[in-house]
């Protein structure tokens, strides 16, 4: 018994002597053997769409007359402000905007493009393409451009349509920009592209960017699309990941460049903006309009 008890004491002492090594690591280098189970942060999209220095941001965005794409589709200052805040967050250099009204009786005789300009930060000049009479006023498309750009020429060209349409052509020192909203009917869209082609030789020798809600897609059959004509002279620059919230696989909003100058243009990034960081949080843009904003950042060579 004495031998066994002595043996027991020795084993107990040996066991306790190992506890510092097992529990505390035993030396200063032991931490390398202890797994770090602290969760590591995962990379996430910030949805801020920062623009790189030296690039030009071109955008197209259908306003849906700023009545929102919610269950309550009404003309309110809040809905107009929401639309303008999307533009303010993305801060394009030039933007084509569709579905605008001016002096319409049932819409408080507002000048919608001006209200959007004010909501977007007011550092833009505006051009309204007054195209068709409506409710005592006019409807049409428009273009906003940063006041620092200083265009050399601005003009408008009438387009055919069941509802009259316009091309807004603006020449800047380094490039040309054409904004529009094409008709719903195929023959009118095709005729509009022919008119666009007719205007190209009249523009300064610089890249020509064509942007808007084209009510058309290169994915459609040739007989119901204007794209076979359009792609003779233009190349699509913008993302085509679905520009309609209610039709996820359909893209009808585009930014293109003329083929004669496409080698002078480098695309840095392009997005159909479905989520956007605004006013301290990420928000869904599908409730603002029935179209998503589409932009492309380019660098001119």
Task: Describe the function of each predicted region.
Residues 22-118, 133-134, 290, 299-301:
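N-terminal, active-site-proximal structural segment of metallo-dependent hydrolase catalytic domains
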Residues 65-68, 102-105, 136, 185-187, ...:
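Active-site environment of divalent metal-dependent phosphoester hydrolases
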Residues 27-46, 155, 200-209, 216-301:
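Metal-dependent phosphoester-hydrolase catalytic domains
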Residues 10-20:
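Bacterial N-terminal signal peptides
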Residues 55-70, 155, 169, 174-183:
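Active-site-proximal beta-strand elements of phosphoester/diester hydrolases
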Residues 33-50, 100-175, 269-273:
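Structured beta-strand-rich core segments of catalytic domains in phosphoester-bond hydrolases
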